[in-house]
Every structure is written in C-alpha cells, then in structure tokens.
C-alpha cells in the first residue's frame, strides 16, 4: 500500500547547473547569471522557450514539478574560473546546499571547468 502512495506523488526536481540548465524566470536566486532568456537573443541561442530546455522536457514528460533551479551561467564545480579568477560565489560547491527539499536532483556541470582549464587536483 505504501509503495502505491509514494509512486502516486508528484516528484519535485531541483537543478544544479551551468548555462545549459538555466532559463530566465526559472532560476533561483534571480541574481544568477543567465544564458537563456524569455525574450530570445538570436545571436546568442536558438532556444525560443523554456519547453526546449533538456530539463524542462524531462520534468514535463514525467509529470514532475520544478522545486529549485540553482543554475549559473559560467559556473565551475571548483572555486577557480576563467583566467584563474575566484568563482567561489558561483561554484557548484557553494550552491549545492541551496536546492530546497527535492526528491530528485539533476547536476549538469564541468563544461566551464574544462573550457577554463581549471586544475583538477588530486583524488584523496
């Protein structure tokens, strides 16, 4: 009986990502740097609406609801960003505690770490 009650509940999904997971109005906090805007900038992207984002399609197709989208354009996993700049405030490590109470968490990252040449460090 308990299994059917749990499976009948709508799952809440949170996102921790970079520009590939962001969309204006669907991001918390609203001060996070954006890449996809509600009013499309054709020179920048061909994404016309939030329904074209990978995460929105998955959430919609499964009947889930968005809890928190804490994505940040240009974010790195580590605290080091482009040109060796301090990216602590936008780091995945900093933002990972700000995802609400979701049932599912999607993490999409490392793109900027790779492009910025961020040091990988050592496995310990």
What are the residue ranges of the model-derived segments?
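Boundary at the C-terminal end of the N-terminal hydrophobic targeting segment
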Residues: 6-8
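Conserved SGNH/GDSL esterase-like catalytic core that processes O-acyl groups on lipids
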Residues: 12-14, 23-123
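Active-site flanking residues adjacent to catalytic metal/cofactor-binding acidic residues
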Residues: 16-18
């Amino acid at each position: 009986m308990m299994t059917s009650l749990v499976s009948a509940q709508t799952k809440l999904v949170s996102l921790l990502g970079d520009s590939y997971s962001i969309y204006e109005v669907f991001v918390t906090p609203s001060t996070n740097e954006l890449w996809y805007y509600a009013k499309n900038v054709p020179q920048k992207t061909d994404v016309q609406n939030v329904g074209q984002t990978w995460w929105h399609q998955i959430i919609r197709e499964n009947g889930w609801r968005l809890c928190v989208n804490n994505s940040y354009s240009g974010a790195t996993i580590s605290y080091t960003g482009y040109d060796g700049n301090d990216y602590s405030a936008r780091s995945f490590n900093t933002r990972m505690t700000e995802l609400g109470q979701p049932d599912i968490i999607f993490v999409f990252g490392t793109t900027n770490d790779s492009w910025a040449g961020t040091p990988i460090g050592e496995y310990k």
